[in-house]
């Protein structure tokens, strides 16, 4: 069970093998063996140290998000880290070029999934299928050029061209605005939030597999930037795009440039309903195998 806490004034505790949730209007008790994870989406929530110890013992995550969807903290047991040999392989791959090859394959997968997302959108918007299919074909062509790239700038150039085609097609066929991470419209706020949830999911698997979240291959090194996480999450972004587009963001989703708490909770619940986390775990495992030189990475397909 995914426990989503979206309201102020909630208190989380532990008693007799159960998660105890105290809130206005009553108390809920959930046996801890039924809890998969706790999502805290707002401030004003307290959590007891006794519960933290119990959650750690049962390997249950607690993840905190700010109002924009940024994962700001995560509680997890210290034993949840993989072997150090994976980090060594990760660092060596930066020098041997194996890491760059991984980044190219992930970016290739992202573009192919963008093309697939447009075709799927065309099934929902039959009157626009031709225009969406045409944009999808152009993006697939750009994806086909990535394996021959010799440097990061080449990859980023094709990725940027594909993004322009992709969001232009989405905007023209849905009536939704284009992609602008700094915009305060409901679509972009929801995408930012969804990408934040995705970022957490990939980050979690990177840590579990013993990788360094900050040592990536495409996203530039910067203090505090989880470059590897940003690299690996790229091919999953079209999943978030389709999820948000399907929900049809509207003006009543936001208040003061921030998504309402109930909308944030809905996005988390929709994300968990997609059941993508086992897929993400598999893909991170494939990335580890690639970094060790055991087998070439196989991108995920939408």
UniProtKB/Swiss-Prot annotation:
CDD domains in the cross-refs: Cas1_I-II-III
InterPro entries: Cas1, CRISPR-assoc_Cas1, CRISPR-assoc_Cas1_C, CRISPR-assoc_Cas1_N
Residues reported to bind Mn(2+): 159, 219, 234
One GO term of the biological process aspect: maintenance of CRISPR repeat elements
EC number: 3.1.-.-
Cofactor field: Mg(2+); Mn(2+)
Keywords: Antiviral defense, DNA-binding, Endonuclease, Hydrolase, Magnesium, Manganese, Metal-binding, Nuclease
Source species, domain of life: Archaea
UniProt GO MF annotations: DNA binding; endonuclease activity; metal ion binding
Alphabetized Gene3D superfamilies for the sequence: CRISPR-associated endonuclease Cas1, C-terminal domain (1.20.120.920), CRISPR-associated endonuclease Cas1, N-terminal domain (3.100.10.20)
Family classification: Belongs to the CRISPR-associated endonuclease Cas1 family.
Role played: CRISPR (clustered regularly interspaced short palindromic repeat), is an adaptive immune system that provides protection against mobile genetic elements (viruses, transposable elements and conjugative plasmids). CRISPR clusters contain spacers, sequences complementary to antecedent mobile elements, and target invading nucleic acids. CRISPR clusters are transcribed and processed into CRISPR RNA (crRNA). Acts as a dsDNA endonuclease. Involved in the integration of spacer DNA into the CRISPR cassette.
Known partners and oligomeric status: Homodimer, forms a heterotetramer with a Cas2 homodimer.
Annotated PANTHER family: CRISPR-ASSOCIATED ENDONUCLEASE CAS1 1 (PTHR34353:SF2)
Name recorded for this polypeptide: CRISPR-associated endonuclease Cas1 1
Organism: Pyrobaculum aerophilum (strain ATCC 51768 / DSM 7523 / JCM 9630 / CIP 104966 / NBRC 100827 / IM2)
């Amino acid at each position: 069970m995914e426990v989503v806490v979206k309201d102020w004034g909630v208190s989380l505790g532990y008693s007799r093998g159960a998660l105890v949730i105290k809130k206005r209007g009553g108390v809920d008790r959930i046996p801890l063996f039924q809890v998969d994870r706790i999502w805290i989406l707002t401030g004003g929530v307290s959590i007891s140290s006794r519960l933290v110890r119990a959650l750690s013992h049962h390997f249950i995550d607690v993840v905190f998000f700010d109002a924009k969807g940024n994962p700001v903290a995560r509680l997890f047991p210290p034993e949840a880290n993989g072997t150090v040999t994976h980090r060594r392989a990760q660092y060596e791959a930066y020098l041997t070029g194996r890491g760059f090859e991984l980044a190219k394959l992930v970016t290739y997968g992202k573009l192919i999934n963008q093309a697939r997302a447009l075709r799927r959108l065309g099934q929902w918007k039959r009157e626009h299928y031709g225009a969406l299919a045409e944009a999808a074909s152009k993006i697939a062509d750009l994806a086909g050029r990535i394996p021959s790239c010799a440097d990061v700038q080449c990859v980023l150039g094709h990725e940027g061209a594909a993004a322009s085609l992709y969001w232009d097609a989405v905007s023209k066929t849905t009536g939704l605005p284009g992609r602008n991470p700094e915009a305060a419209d409901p679509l972009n706020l929801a995408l930012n939030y969804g990408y934040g949830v995705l970022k957490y999911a990939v980050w979690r698997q990177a840590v579990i597999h013993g990788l360094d979240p900050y040592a990536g291959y495409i996203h530039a090194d910067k203090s505090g930037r989880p470059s590897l996480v940003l690299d690996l999450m790229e091919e999953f972004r079209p999943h978030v795009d389709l999820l948000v587009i399907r929900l049809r963001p509207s003006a009543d989703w936001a208040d003061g440039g921030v998504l309402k708490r109930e909308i944030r909770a809905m996005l988390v619940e929709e994300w968990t309903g997609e059941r993508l986390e086992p897929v993400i775990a598999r893909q991170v495992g494939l990335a580890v195998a690639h970094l060790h030189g055991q087998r070439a990475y196989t991108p995920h397909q939408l």
